């Protein structure tokens, strides 16, 4: 079993003078995510690479699965490290690597050498050719294919010689915590968990607000949202979830406002409450799972009407995505099956038969004036009675 993993990253490498900030954040996140994995791990960075070193007694599959969910990582390479004892020893190490990893030697290959240590006495091209020749001598059944090889034999000349031929893809993106914090409006649907995942992939720490409407929505609906948060937390880390009792506000809107405007007005008050908690939590914006035209409340005019009540930016990472693309991501991050469980949330009750799709903001504000005698107290009660749940990965 491999004792060391070479961690590759992409965008971090072009960050110039601030690169160390992103590297340090990545190292910190790797240590945090590995804390519950069986085994002992040391994480260190070294000239454009991060290494995860183990004591050899660890759960390989769980370790790889955990690393493959850490934003900022583009590749996870089980690697063999060797002292530089000359070119002949390097070739011997490559032969041993192939013997160890591949039972069937009838494959095509390419040698890909990289010299991080420029004082090495051979160029990368010379290493490629010479090592390739040694591999062909040792394993005559192999063939060279520089265009589409079945096996890529990677050699990195660093303080230690790095040899690896497997690269497990990571999620990419930027390390968590390098781009501030934002508040996700999380429901039990397909879209908002995906939106949270995508914004977290850009380095944003996410908190969340969920609007609960008992007795019209059940405890199972609430648990469904908590379960979704747990799945997102596998990528984003711990999520602070605000559970808001929205029932009385919804009932007041239903009783006093035009029914074709119910959804827009409810969304506006949801945004106000979510922004309140975002301010408290020092977030820099709100996140929603809205996509243009997907439902009546997500036309351009409707989005403008909900935006109008917000002072901070509203980020919509799914805004131009097709539903099938969103579903693909939800399957990838394992939220889809939970999202389609048949428990209603507050966005699916009190829905108008014919909701307005091109709301006029002045008319909406006029309708909201009907709530003036009750809304301040209802908002205060909803905020004061909000339950906070700290959600960790499942």
UniProtKB/Swiss-Prot annotation:
Report the principal subcellular site. Answer: cytoplasm
The catalysed reaction is:
[ThiI sulfur-carrier protein]-S-sulfanyl-L-cysteine + a uridine in tRNA + 2 reduced [2Fe-2S]-[ferredoxin] + ATP + H(+) = [ThiI sulfur-carrier protein]-L-cysteine + a 4-thiouridine in tRNA + 2 oxidized [2Fe-2S]-[ferredoxin] + AMP + diphosphate; [ThiS sulfur-carrier protein]-C-terminal Gly-Gly-AMP + S-sulfanyl-L-cysteinyl-[cysteine desulfurase] + AH2 = [ThiS sulfur-carrier protein]-C-terminal-Gly-aminoethanethioate + L-cysteinyl-[cysteine desulfurase] + A + AMP + 2 H(+)
MF terms in GO:
ATP binding; CCA tRNA nucleotidyltransferase activity; tRNA binding; tRNA-uracil-4 sulfurtransferase activity
Pathway this chain belongs to: Cofactor biosynthesis; thiamine diphosphate biosynthesis
Per UniProt, which keywords does this protein have?
A: ATP-binding, Cytoplasm, Nucleotide-binding, RNA-binding, Thiamine biosynthesis, Transferase, tRNA-binding
Binding of ATP: at which residues? Answer: 185-186, 210-211, 267, 289, 298
One Pfam family hit? ThiI
Query: What span is annotated as the signal peptide, if there is one?
Result: none
Instruction: Answer yes or no on keyword Nucleotide-binding.
Output: yes
UniProt gene name: thiI
Question: Do you know which SMART domains this protein is assigned to?
Answer: THUMP
- Origin organism is Agathobacter rectalis (strain ATCC 33656 / DSM 3377 / JCM 17463 / KCTC 5835 / VPI 0990) (Eubacterium rectale)
Q: Does the keyword tRNA-binding apply?
A: yes
Q: What is its EC number?
A: 2.8.1.4
Subcellular location, record wording: Cytoplasm
Q: Which InterPro entries match?
A: Rossmann-like_a/b/a_fold, ThiI_AANH, ThiI_fer, ThiI_N, THUMP_dom, THUMP_ThiI, tRNA_STrfase, tRNA_sulfurtransferase_ThiI
The entry's protein name is Probable tRNA sulfurtransferase
Which parts pass through the membrane?
Answer: none
**Gene Ontology cellular component list:** cytosol
| Domain THUMP positions | 61-168
Instruction: Report the CDD domains cross-referenced here.
Output: PPase_ThiI, THUMP_ThiI
Similarity comment text for this entry: Belongs to the ThiI family.
Primary role: Catalyzes the ATP-dependent transfer of a sulfur to tRNA to produce 4-thiouridine in position 8 of tRNAs, which functions as a near-UV photosensor. Also catalyzes the transfer of sulfur to the sulfur carrier protein ThiS, forming ThiS-thiocarboxylate. This is a step in the synthesis of thiazole, in the thiamine biosynthesis pathway. The sulfur is donated as persulfide by IscS.
Per the UniProt entry, what are the Gene Ontology biological process annotations, in alphabetical order?
thiamine biosynthetic process; thiamine diphosphate biosynthetic process; thiazole biosynthetic process; tRNA 4-thiouridine biosynthesis
């Amino acid at each position: 079993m491999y004792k060391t993993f070479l961690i590759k990253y992409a965008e971090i490498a072009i960050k110039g003078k601030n690169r160390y900030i992103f590297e340090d954040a990545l190292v910190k996140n790797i240590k945090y995510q590995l804390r519950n994995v069986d085994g002992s791990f040391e994480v260190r960075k070294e000239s454009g690479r991060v290494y995860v070193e183990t004591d050899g007694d660890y759960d390989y599959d769980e370790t790889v699965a955990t690393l493959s969910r850490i934003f900022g990582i583009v590749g996870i390479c089980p690697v063999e490290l060797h002292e530089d004892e000359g070119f002949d020893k390097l070739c011997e190490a490559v032969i041993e690597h192939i013997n160890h990893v591949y039972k069937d030697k009838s494959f095509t290959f390419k040698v890909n050498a990289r010299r991080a240590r420029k004082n090495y006495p051979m160029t990368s091209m010379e290493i490629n050719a010479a090592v390739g020749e040694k591999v062909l001598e040792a394993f005559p059944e192999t063939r060279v294919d520089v265009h589409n090889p079945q096996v890529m034999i990677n050699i990195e000349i660093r303080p230690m010689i790095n040899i690896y031929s497997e690269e497990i893809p990571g999620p990419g993106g930027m390390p968590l915590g390098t781009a501030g914090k934002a508040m996700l409006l999380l429901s039990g649907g397909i879209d908002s968990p995906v939106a949270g995942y995508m914004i977290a992939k850009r380095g944003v720490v996410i908190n969340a607000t969920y609007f609960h409407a008992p007795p019209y929505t059940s405890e199972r609906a609430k648990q469904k949202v908590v379960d979704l948060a747990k799945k997102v937390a596998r990528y984003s880390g711990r999520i602070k979830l605000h559970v808001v009792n929205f029932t009385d506000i919804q009932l007041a809107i239903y009783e006093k406002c035009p029914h074709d405007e119910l959804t827009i007005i409810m969304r506006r008050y949801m945004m106000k409450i979510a922004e309140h908690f975002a301010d408290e939590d020092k977030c820099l914006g709100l996140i929603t799972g809205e996509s243009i035209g997907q439902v009546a409340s997500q036309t351009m005019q409707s989005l403008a009407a909900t935006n109008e009540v917000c002072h901070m930016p509203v980020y919509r990472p799914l805004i131009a995505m097709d539903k099938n693309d969103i579903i693909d991501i939800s399957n990838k991050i394992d939220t889809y099956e939970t999202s389609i469980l048949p428990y209603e949330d507050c966005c699916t009750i009190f829905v108008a038969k014919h909701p307005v799709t091109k709301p006029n903001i002045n008319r909406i504000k006029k309708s909201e004036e009907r709530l003036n005698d009750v809304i301040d107290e209802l908002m205060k009660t909803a905020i004061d009675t909000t339950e906070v749940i700290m959600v960790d990965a499942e």
